[in-house]
């Protein structure tokens, strides 16, 4: 290949297929940040989902801030009618993958059954994804089955997999099959490095790239309520929102000006409302799910943000990053890897929610912070977020990784069966034969 062609390919916009279980998800707006950052850099992203159209889709797309022009390919009845033809075209790779799934079914019976049921949709996605430069599994779950199918075909797209919270907890055949077929494996916390290095094949590069947040412009300080506390999460028992209410109740006993606003929704909402009502906590306001931008405004008006989650899969929650960028004094549970976000008490406080009084003591200290101390803390926290947790900067790191793999020697088939399927516009793309990536 000529040097000029290499330079052109190295700077050309990438076509990226993003694979999701479902999209969008209210508690995963970081996915939208990734896609928006890629689009802002000139790359073309198409979303493929394993699950069908969500309820109240238009409202969900709006509240999550999904770009209007983003193509989203979901399973549907018309899509399912095309699955038999796709399965026939992919009968070799599909049969091999089914065999791999069945071989592990004794150890993972439920996951194996789910994987077999998802196989037709995975084949349909793989059939369309051949025309892309990159196919990225956002989670190493059922939709990640697309990667071993593409690998078996030696299709052109670079195959990468993210391993995160759900994958670490499941640690099952879906993770093994997805990661085993990836040409690069990414996770978002240094605490996960040992795991992904153990899971990835020896020749496959691994990299830690943090989930980023958009650096929303900041408002002027001076409008912050010094006694306003907030939390934001899915309202499920593992998020321990009751622990936040109890900590604020203890702080309010010392100063009745303390209030708590709770943002989010979920099955635990009714119980939390009843818990507060029975105790006469009229200063607790459960306000439901709001847009990311609206939540950020609330953060900039609050003094303290608390997240006392006990969820085993909690890793560097983006809502904590947003609270730090907004200038809140942050109190977080000691979830794995949280020290990457809160290196010491000058950035925020880490507590063990299982230790009686730990959150209450941290909250009293946060509410007693001087304005000078708060100003210094905000400057340090914002510098950390800008340097390590900007979605624009971190998606540039993804692009660099994808380009490195694209430009490395790879084995790509030129057989008719492995050529990309025609796009909706009738376009196809030729494929080069290259030696295997080492």
Name each region found by the language model.
Residues 289-290, 297-302:
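Short alpha-helical donor nucleotide-sugar binding micro-motif in glycosyltransferases
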Residues 300-314, 328:
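Acidic donor-binding loop of glycosyltransferase active sites
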